[in-house]
Amino acid sequence: SQCKAMTVKFTVELDIERLTGQTYTDFIKNLRRSLATWYLHGVPVLPLYNQEADPRGFDLKLTFRGQVTTVRIHRDDLVLRGYQMQGAGKWLELERPSTQTGHLIEGSELLEFGPSYEELAAAAQQDILDISYNKNALQDAVSKLAVSTNTRDRARSLIVVSQMFCEATRFVDIANHFAFNLESSEPVKLPQWMQNDLEKNWVRFSFMILKSNADPCYKFEPQTIYGKIIKTADELLNFLGIVEQHPDTRSPPCAAG
């Protein structure tokens, strides 16, 4: 079925040239607040993920020394879906033409790769863990997205933006890691445990946290993060910067007692 075009709910802007670890941290925290529909023990929860209604997005406008690129991110799941080159007007969408799902961004040109990290890494010809994530990398990403038509450069730059904004918004440890190392002159890599233990589990962790909160009969399965056993949903919640709200978590709880 043809999907509907995404409506943009708000736009946030960030100048990469003057970015510091502190202003980056503040930006991520403000972004979480802008996205929140409610809070669970102080942690923002995203709007209900809805596949029937018109998809909602937000734009992130990034500038560096006069160069501009705007990326469009799906609000319900924080997946980067497209971007706009400098002065081009036309949007480029992360979707292979062969998927036949239609355009999430109206009038967009479909790229040769989809939004998953597997497809992005294949197009970039580089592993997620081999890419650098710091201020230099972000400046380079903005410059490349503003003007480059090279698939490898585009894909690598989109990975940098997705990690440093989408993943950092999802996870406290990832935001802290990027903030602490932002101004490093050496390449800054993503630790493997953050990819394996956190990033690959955000949807599942979100579900477990909200289900535990809504359903007294839900049995929480202990999780392992960085070698530590996490025994409760409240403990797991501490790792999340924002929680995805899946419709399944709102099913009526069992009859307790």
From Swiss-Prot:
Its EC number is 3.2.2.22. Pfam families: RIP. GO terms for biological process: defense response; negative regulation of translation. Transmembrane segments: none annotated. It is an enzyme of class 3 (hydrolase). One of its GO terms (molecular function) is rRNA N-glycosylase activity. InterPro entries: Ribosome-inact_prot_sf, Ribosome_inactivat_1/2, Ribosome_inactivat_prot, Ribosome_inactivat_prot_sub1, Ribosome_inactivat_prot_sub2. Disulfide bonds join C217-C254. It catalyses: Endohydrolysis of the N-glycosidic bond at one specific adenosine on the 28S rRNA. The active site is at E167. Keywords: Disulfide bond, Hydrolase, Plant defense, Protein synthesis inhibitor, Toxin. The record marks V79, Y117, R170 as: Important for catalytic activity. Inhibits translation in rabbit reticulocytes. Belongs to the ribosome-inactivating protein family. Type 1 RIP subfamily. This is Ribosome-inactivating protein charybdin. It comes from Drimia maritima (Sea squill). The lineage of its organism: Eukaryota, Viridiplantae, Streptophyta, Embryophyta, Tracheophyta.
